[in-house]
């Protein structure tokens, strides 16, 4: 795991869409993460960390 990935994961825990945006910009992953974060903060975090690590 590189330093950029660690920073993205930390941002994904604090504000999930920001961490995903840094890697995928306005792609499908970002919009899914934003929707999950709006519907429930914890699902947004789980999805963001999953997308960034896998």
From Swiss-Prot:
Stored PROSITE patterns: UPF0057 (PS01309)
Superkingdom of this protein's organism: Eukaryota
Membrane topology: Multi-pass membrane protein
Gene Ontology CC entries for this record: membrane
Species the sequence originates in: Hordeum vulgare
Membrane-spanning residues: 2-22, 34-54
Protein name as annotated: Low temperature-induced protein lt101.1
Tissue: Expressed in shoot meristems, mature leaves and roots.
Protein family membership: Belongs to the UPF0057 (PMP3) family.
Cellular location(s): Membrane
Main location group: membrane
Induction: By cold shock and salt stress, but not by drought or abscisic acid (ABA).
PANTHER family referenced in this protein's UniProt entry, alphabetically: HYDROPHOBIC PROTEIN RCI2 LOW TEMPERATURE AND SALT RESPONSIVE PROTEIN LTI6 -RELATED, OS03G0286900 PROTEIN
Gene: LT101.1
Keywords for this protein: Membrane, Stress response, Transmembrane, Transmembrane helix
InterPro entries assigned to the protein according to its UniProt record, in alphabetical order: PMP3
């Amino acid at each position: 795991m590189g330093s950029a990935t660690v920073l993205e994961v930390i941002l994904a825990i604090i504000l999930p869409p920001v961490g995903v945006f840094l890697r995928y910009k306005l792609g499908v992953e970002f919009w899914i993460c934003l929707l999950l974060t709006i519907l429930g903060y914890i699902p947004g975090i789980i999805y963001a960390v999953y997308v960034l690590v896998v």
